[in-house]
Each structure stands twice: as C-alpha cells, then as structure tokens.
Amino acid sequence: IDTSVGRLGVLVCWDQWYPEAARLMALAGADLLLYPTAIGWDPEDVQEEKTRQRDAWVLSHRGHAVANGLPVLSCNRVGHEASPLDASGIDFWGNSHVLGPQGEFIAEAGTEATLLVVDVDLGRSEHVRRIWPFLRDRRIDAYADLTRRYID
C-alpha cells in the first residue's frame, strides 16, 4: 500500500506468522511491514505457556525484520473477549511494538491500551541491507518447492 510515509507491506493477523509473506512484501518494495492483529491466549493457560506464546510471536517479528532488512510495526489489541463457544474466552496480550531493520526494539507497549508515536528511519534499511545482503544472496533457484504444499 503506497502512502505518504512510504510503501506499507500489510500482513493481517494470521498472515504475520509466515516468513514467505513478509519476504513477498519486501520483494514488492515495502518500506516497512505492518502487522495489525488480535492475538492472545486462553486465560486458563499457565503463565509459562503464555510467555512461550508471546515470546514466539515477538521472535517471529524480529526474524522478519532481520531477514528482510525492514522495520516491523505490530499493533495488537488488549483486553478480554468472551466467547459463546468457550466459557474462558480470550485475553489479548497487547505488547504492540516497533522493530528496526535489525530486529532491535524501537518502542514497545505493555498490556494496557497505549498510543506509540515513533520516528522510524526508513533510510536505515538500505544500510542494513548492505551489511546483510540477504535479498541479493538468496538462492531462488533452490526454492521451487516452496510453491508446493508438501515435498514428496
């Protein structure tokens, strides 16, 4: 999506888990990756499980930033939503964040509703891509099987 601040690569909710989707956005010229989402956990999960889930979510975003040399902005909802199918519903964990093109935290919200206002240096991506030329050095001739659901 072309905007006044640059080209946004938007991956909504579940799509943000796929590194291929982030890579396609980078190859299409995205200046930053934007991940609007609504992710949380079952309130009955033990704390260790909650921590594992949230940490995996953040780690995947950091990996997308590094692998593509792009900032990642992830905005997640907060609060509880009851479910007619499940008595416990879902607790949304918040933790919206802004990452730089090397996966570093620029800003992070907590578990409450928060407005983050952040300056992101989009020019840094080019510098990072010179240090780590992952897009240049990828072996596209070896990736044909990515278009198949399973490899026989």
Located regions from the model:
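A short, polar/charged loop-to-alpha-helix boundary motif
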Residues: 113-131
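Generic alpha-helical secondary structure signal
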Residues: 55, 59, 123-126, 141
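Active-site beta-strand termini and strand-to-loop segments that position acidic
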Residues: 1-4, 101, 120
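Residue-level signal for alpha-helical context at structural boundaries
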Residues: 79, 120-121, 143-146
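Alpha-helix N-cap/helix-start capping motif
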Residues: 15-16, 122
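CN hydrolase (nitrilase-like) catalytic-core segments centered on the catalytic cysteine
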Residues: 7, 16-116
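Cysteine/selenocysteine-centered motifs that mediate thiol-based redox chemistry or coordinate metal-sulfur cofactors
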Residues: 2-5, 12-14, 23-27, 37, ...
